A protein has these predicted regions:
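Trp/Phe/Arg-rich N-terminal binding region typifying the photolyase-homology
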Residues: 1-160, 264
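Intrinsically disordered, low-complexity regulatory segments enriched
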Residues: 14, 59, 135-138, 198, ...
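Glycine/tryptophan-enriched, flexible segments
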Residues: 119, 142-296, 300
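Acidic/His metal-coordination segments adjacent to aromatic residues that form catalytic metal sites
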Residues: 302-308
């Protein structure tokens, strides 16, 4: 008899290894792995067509890793999660934190509702070496400039947590009554332009680790020099492997950031500053949400027309 079901809400963390939310959920009797395509809260920040295609492939890869047990939904996560915990013997809901302002506002509301329903709710750090509130200047204010943030903040901060492995044992459930298929989310392009991209990428957790190893062996040693020489082959290697591939895999969470960062920090201090750019973005946006469309420095008050 099912008495203890934990929901693991996948968002930007479509992997099994080094996934704190999944590891915590796996401590319960049963795990209900869930993905919700949020059509209510993103507003103008809905992913574009290429991102949707990548998401489509990532969801299929994740579902395969879970033995076909991923329950997929579309709509307002607040309503969907409330419905799930009412219909099933759910005792806990776990997720890894997202740091977009709209995501944080949504998650706070959802956590409040679920707690009022008597559900244990835990959010975890599954994407950053340090939380936004952990790296601050001596006066307690957040950093605005990357170099001091990295040199004084990151390099003097407490060591990041050790990476987690995949849960060794999980009893997975599926919400067969109301779940959708990945294909039903209508994420694939209406025209088959994705066929020209697909041969060049292996999407999913396995492909992300392959891309990381490729960067370490073929791009890392040349990154400091190659990133500044756009006319040279080194630049193309570094950009394709490090910038384009890693940013997409980080976005869908197939490449676990704490694990990859720790590995790369050991290998090369020169490139470790570069791989911290995504961290400073996630740290500054929650503090200054206006950075999405407005400068943080008052020395340059003009509108950012290039974003319009």
């Amino acid at each position: 008899m099912m008495e203890d079901v934990a929901v693991c809400w996948f968002r930007q963390d479509m992997r099994l290894s080094d996934n704190p939310a999944l590891s915590a959920a796996a401590e319960h009797q049963y795990v209900l792995p869930v993905y919700i395509l949020d059509t209510k809260n993103p507003g103008t920040f809905v992913p574009g067509a290429a991102s949707q295609w990548w998401l489509y492939c990532s969801l299929h890869a994740l579902n395969q890793s879970l033995g076909g047990k991923l329950s997929v939904y579309e709509g307002d996560p607040k309503q969907i999660l409330a419905d799930i915990v009412q219909r099933l013997p759910v005792t806990a809901v776990h997720w890894n934190r997202c740091y977009e302002p709209w995501s944080m506002e949504r998650d706070t509301k959802i956590k409040t509702i679920l707690l009022q329903m008597g559900i244990q709710v835990e959010s975890h750090n599954g994407s950053l070496l340090w939380e936004p509130w952990d790296i601050k200047k001596a006066d307690g204010t957040p950093y605005r400039v990357f170099t001091p943030f990295y040199r004084k903040g990151c390099l003097n901060a407490a060591a990041p947590r050790k990476p987690l492995g995949s849960p060794k044992e999980m009893s997975l459930l599926q919400d067969e009554d109301k779940m959708l298929s990945v294909d039903a989310l209508d994420l694939k392009p209406k025209f088959n332009w994705d066929e020209t991209l697909a041969p060049h990428w292996t999407i999913g957790e396995e492909g992300a680790h392959h891309r990381l190893e490729e960067f370490i062996h073929n791009g890392l040693a040349h990154y400091k020099e190659g990133r500044n020489l756009p006319a040279k082959p080194l630049y193309l290697v570094c950009r394709r492997i490090f910038v384009l591939g890693k940013s997409l895999q980080i976005r869908c969470g197939t490449l676990q950031r704490p694990r990859e960062m720790a590995k790369t920090l050991i290998i090369s201090a020169a490139s470790s500053a570069g791989v911290n750019f995504p961290i400073v973005c996630c740290i500054t946006i929650p503090i200054w949400p206006q950075l999405i469309c407005k400068r943080s420095l008052t020395d340059f008050p003009g509108p950012m027309t290039w974003l319009l």
